[in-house]
Regions:
Chain A
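Cys/His-coordinated zinc-binding microdomains
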Residues: 83
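Secretory/periplasmic and organellar redox-cofactor proteins
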Residues: 1-80, 89-92, 96, 100-197
């Protein structure tokens, strides 16, 4: 599989991740005011909730594999900010596996902090790519963080893909359901809360 | 797992894996016909006709100390002389020929160089090449795997007029002048001595000041 194909695949997945995060956010926010949206949100939670933490493991595995592909096969040298994001993403694989196994609400909430930390680094890295002077007015001759290795669909750079993965993991942990699945409720407020204990 | 699972639970994880495989196939199909490695031509290889992105250079004289913060120890030192060639093979020399010079070291992948080149190109287009001072650019740190490759195409796109010396793959010309960051400017007086070295994006006014100092009037 060529580097072009891999970056295109990761770009497709990043767009899917962004769409999922946006959908969950819209359903959650709009569901507070609109009962019909709240019911939809409840259905979404019941649909995603039981397997959300396992999906989060899959997202972390794909992101880690993509990162290793870029550095080890495509030979895109990771910069300092790339390494910070790696330090966050790589341990997420075993941590999320543990979360998926234990399915404890407390663990899920604590684990949510990790991808949010990664997302903040990715967000800063994206800003440095667009505004290189944020870091420095010169380029480090070896490997500046402002260097854009990949750009798909006019906006998807490697840190943007990482941000999408971190946000999707955090979102999946948020909707992940640690409790047994209850039958659907007719009460929209209960439905929105889903199976949150 | 200590909780019960719904018997009708949708197999999301296997479906997600399947979706990744399908998207991978779509990505392979859509990427067919492009470069196998997505990186274009290798550094130093023939791109079009006799264009080469890196060329051998030879350096005579002592290398300048690395450029750093504070007082520049290179000011007043004789600059090394570099002989090499442009992308098309035409001979280019940075030599002590009695003409003041401003050298610009550029890396195709550096976003600051990418911003600086149009500024300098527009300045030359509007005001013409500065009289009595030779502008020489050095395309260095050329790496085929990095963005905005090849530098010859980039500079042509930008309407770049100054002479370009294509540095070798080791960046010998850049090292000889003590480059530590991009973009990098060196002003040399008529005696071939270093007047000033500066790195980073420069405004038109700063470039004009640098040219004036090379002339000895700044």
């Amino acid at each position: 599989m060529s580097t072009d194909a891999v970056t295109l695949l990761l770009a497709f997945l990043a767009v899917l991740a962004q769409a999922t995060v946006a959908a969950v956010l819209v359903l959650s926010v709009a569901g507070r005011r609109l009962p019909s949206v709240a019911r939809l949100g409840g259905s979404m939670r019941r649909f995603l909730g039981p397997q959300a933490s396992s999906l989060a493991v899959l997202v972390a595995v794909v992101a880690t594999s993509g990162s290793l592909y870029f550095s080890e096969i495509a030979h895109f040298t990771p910069c300092r900010l790339c390494w910070y994001q790696r330090f966050v993403m790589y341990p997420l694989v075993p941590i999320l596996m543990m979360v998926a196994r234990r399915r404890s609400r407390v663990l899920q909430r604590v684990a949510m902090v990790i991808p949010l930390l990664g997302a903040s680094v990715s967000g800063y890295h994206m800003a440095v790519e667009r505004f290189p002077s944020l870091e420095s007015t010169t380029c480090d001759p070896t490997n500046p963080c402002s260097l854009i290795w990949v750009e798909r669909f006019g906006y998807l750079t490697i840190p943007t893909m990482a941000l999408s993965a971190f946000l999707l993991i955090a979102t999946l942990l948020w909707v992940a359901d640690p409790a047994p699945i209850d039958p659907p409720s007719d009460d929209p407020v209960v439905a929105l809360k889903g199976t949150v204990s | 797992m200590n909780e019960k699972r719904s018997p009708r639970s949708f197999p999301l994880v296997p479906i997600a894996v399947g979706m990744i495989v399908v998207l991978g196939l779509v990505a392979v199909l859509l990427s067919r016909g492009g470069d196998d490695d997505g990186s274009g031509v290798e550094a130093g290889s023939v791109a079009t006709g006799s264009i080469r992105e890196t060329r051998p250079v030879s350096v005579a004289g002592a290398a300048l100390p690395p450029h750093g913060e504070g007082v520049d120890a290179a000011v007043g030192l004789p600059a090394p002389e570099v002989t090499g060639a442009a992308f098309d093979g035409d001979a280019v020399a940075i030599s002590n020929d009695g003409t003041p010079k401003v050298l610009m070291f550029l890396a195709h992948w550096c976003p600051h160089c990418q911003k600086e080149v149009p500024v300098v190109a527009q300045w030359i287009e509007q005001k013409g090449a500065p009289e009595g001072v030779e502008l020489v650019s050095v395309a260095t740190a050329t790496v085929a795997e990095r963005p905005n490759y090849p530098p010859s195409a980039w500079l042509e796109r930008e309407g770049w007029q100054p002479v370009v010396l294509a540095d070798d793959e080791q960046g010998s010309a850049a090292t000889a002048f003590g480059l530590t960051a991009f973009p990098f400017f060196v002003a040399l007086d008529a005696q071939g001595k270093v007047v000033e070295r500066v790195s980073g994006e420069l405004t038109v006014q700063q470039i004009e000041d640098l040219v004036a100092r090379a002339r000895g009037v700044g």
